[in-house]
């Protein structure tokens, strides 16, 4: 019996079912190895689409790594003026600076250090952004797996000591003074976004084990390797710390609501159609099967973000603002490192990558500029999907 069950598991994980249409296929697409030929061709066409965004101004929250980085990069390459937010602006700048075509769009990029856990950070961001109209708002920033303070410690030196940079906008005044304030009374000081990552708010923020966060070891995204045996993606409902519940709701839901509301006047006065994209996920989808009691806090936050789209989009349409939600697809395995997805190994190579996720975000905008007037919809794999 055990052998039969094992064979069934192997058959499930080795099955050839298209990532998009979920139909069986015999021959995989040449580029997308987990798609049928038809879906692969469609996705490749979408991956390569572009439009002229010269004269457009965009705000992308969470633009330092992964999908947020790719989204901002594509907007810049299409000619847009782009403002990104991140807790670590110096690290973000280094990532953009490393791009081969950075000199072509350097003067169109602004990076702002913001910690969305702090309502004052959001307020300061809004005050800065309000200097001129906005065409595109992409609510991408999210906390899915909470990382402890030591995870970010290696970034602090550059963030607090680096010389001024024309691409980085500081909302916090003199950072050298903030560095002096960092210790020993960190909780009581006014900190910049990078320094706030070192606040010790939960027991995990006191981890000192180099075997868990090995110094100098980075993952495929250039981020600290995290070898914890458990993380918040695996938390059952009763295991979620109250503070983490608050952080997730604040970052993933409250911040997008505030930004959309407060930046409405800028979106209304852009002089053309403007766009709000709420970056969602299947965790927040009521229609999706296979729901369980893990990471309930992220599910709730994404469901709330979807409800923002459903309830506000018709109102925004009156002002020529087109709001939609987009599921970017499964790009990162959030399970803790030792966990296995299949019978033999942890899945690390996904069916799509960050560029595919970014193009899913940008697709409603590109089609909108081409004449489409979609609003109040959830898109998955470029198609409308049930809520």
Give the residues covered by each predicted segment.
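A glycine-rich helix->loop->beta "capping" turn
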Residues: 106-110, 128-139, 151, 209
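Residues immediately within or flanking Cys/His clusters that coordinate Zn2+
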Residues: 15-18, 33, 57
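Short cysteine-rich clusters marking metal-coordination/redox-active sites
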Residues: 18-21, 36-39, 276
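Conserved Rossmann-fold cofactor-binding substructure of NAD(P)-dependent oxidoreductases
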Residues: 114-132
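Catalytic loop of short-chain dehydrogenase/reductase
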Residues: 142-249, 254-257, 261-320, 328-347
